[in-house]
Amino acid sequence: MDDAELLGAAGAALAAELEDADDVPTRREQFVVPEGVAYLAGNSLGLQQHAVRAAVDDVLEAWSTLGVDAHEHGAFPWLPYHETMRETVAGLVGAKPGEAVVMNSLTVNLHTMLGSFYRPTPDRPRIVIEADVFPSDRYAVMGAARAHGLDPAEVVVVLRADDIARFLDLEGASVATVVLSAVDFRTGALLDIPAITEAAHRAGARIGWDLAHAAGNVPLRLHDWDVDFAVWCHYKYVNAGPGAVGGCFVHERHGNDASIVRPGGWWGHDPVSRFAMPFAFDPVPGAEGWQVSNPPILAMAPVRVSLDLFAEVGMEALRARSVRLTGFLDRLLDVVASRRKIEVITPRAPDRRGAQLSIVVDDARAVTDALFERFRVRADDRPPNVIRLAPAPLYNTYEDCWRAASALDMVQSSTW
């Protein structure tokens, strides 16, 4: 087949063949997919599982029929609700049970972790971030510097991702903490987490990872990679709904370290004595000791359902399907790029990226709008000129990829 034919009927037929042949079947039937839409924006907000509505309704029913007694009774009592996700959230990020917890939101968790793991000294005042970090992380890091009476302009080191490991080898003795994004939100590039983590530790620094675009997207081994801490959201690839409760990882070697400052809150207190309300804070061992307030159960229900599905399918299987889906889309975008004015800026090697492919076009917002209004293809865009397409392996299909590339070709040809 000539590559140019991939954008026509022959490509649609090939997409159907690839779907039938994939040994990791789609779970599309378990999701509410907007009618007629090729939805490739799961890197922004994942789709809703059908099971979510029932899970939320169960909480509402328990509240209406049991009231306060639902804390200890019902199918999923509220007091230990977060514990029902202890193993599934750990499995999502490659942690040991107890090293990961569902709580707060990503930036709140980042502030919490910086309060514990950014402890500057006169010799080690610096904190390293990457140049193209999502702004919320930059704001949190700058705030952490100010909280210690330091000038962010003097202690926050902003580097290109490719320069971080070398900088740590050369100047790491002045670095207290490193905070990086595992997957770049604009380009979709995946950093070498274990190598950079090792470089940070060689330098004597602690390192934390923002997994917003990595959790549920690529397999993670946070415990084995010796990561100090990590934070993430559950509303992108994990599909737990807008503003979903986030996640936090603390390596077990820090879990009982009394020298590490924790925020302190009653839900992080040992549950055996929590309701005795003692004067002194006695934290739960592990990441759960960083909890502050009791969990929002209505918001936790979609997270529980979503994590259960990931545990059922398995990240390795999902990653295998994801590599094939994104590879097919990549091949199609190459055809578009050969005849239209677009440029793929995501690394081409599968081990350097997740599901997302990012392309540069003129007037990205207008192109994104045209893709949806004319062809019912949902992508998203980020300034100044980037369109992001992310086939989510749980519910996207090869046909979705073909529709996206074919529509992009027509939009860029101005024949629509």
Regions found by a protein language model. Name each.
Residues 1-416:
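Pyridoxal 5′-phosphate
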